[in-house]
């Protein structure tokens, strides 16, 4: 009887608890409208340890951030070189990037890789710098290997020829690829043939490049006077300073030469650049204009938010329009690239079916215009800010990100608290700020609409595209960015049907 009473008492208590939870849930649901996005909370406060900085006699700038949270350390070396125009030997830097880091003059490639693997470390060396990371106990040795790879790179004719041939094969593979042709022509036309960002690698330029060219390129542009070494992690400043001085102090400094090149310009009025790819089953449509855009711009953060709302991801307007609503593409995105050495780019892009190529081009222009002519919605603004906050916080887990922040503050002359206040600046952006930034950077009246695809199926409709009440001028190019006459294009078109 006692057991029955206890059981009944327990059941009664459980029923009361359930009743309370149901009533509480009902009350909460009555107060919470799930159709309304909750308001964003305050931006999390971010504090970066201020690096301790010193310079070696050869000009190498070293920044050390002590962080004993985990028994790990990393080193990031980068060169703040000017943009480099390679000219007749375009591609030599690409060959070089694959050669460095594969052993040194004192350590064979096999021994080099084996030792890195044994320590469970990472060491990546390219023509523009190096990154290394490991557990604390291995870090001194990893730093030694990094210094050896940078100061005593191993360049052999055999490895040079191997890497050159790999790039040649890659070029052959991309001969009929619509995306590859689009990228090449877009860069060339946007920046120009004499601009480092406009030149492209060809079989001919690779044939002209020699091993000595690669060695000269490395020696000319790998100088401590233009280099920054950022060390982060469980290290002691005095010990690291002594170690770095021993390893990098003998590195010979030299003046890094820079070349002049014309500044890219936008067209006087919007135009279409058409590139015929006879085998294309889809078209690449890109709306591109150049902009003066870097971290010191007063509307920098507003422009970032504007781009996020337009096409910075799967929640962007371009994606929702061309993918979710119309089903024309697997994805449509936008970007705004920054540079403190030349002009950056605004790009809105989609890869679509041939039959909707002209319509996609019009929709991209319309979405860009909409950003300029109307305010974004509150939920779009809040979502963009939340996405930036999440991405920014997650990025801080990567030591190379922190190293990049420290380097940027020096090379771009930014305030010391620039990244500490990054999220605050993002969250202070208003709808008015977004619209003004769109007006400043989304230059739909002076832009190029690049369309790369199968002319026999899309050219007629492209030539009838209208913008602002009049037909858009069309210019014709081959896949190597050579401008051609329409009649020549039509001749090739007729020959394909013979």
Walk through the language-model features, giving the residues of each:
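A structural supersecondary motif
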Residues: 286-288, 310-352
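An aromatic/glycine/proline-enriched structural segment found at the starts
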Residues: 32-40, 228-294, 453-493
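Acidic/histidine-enriched segments that form metal/cofactor-coordinating
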Residues: 9, 32-35, 39, 113-217, ...
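M16/insulysin-pitrilysin zinc metalloprotease superfamily fold
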Residues: 103-106, 134-164, 294, 337-395, ...
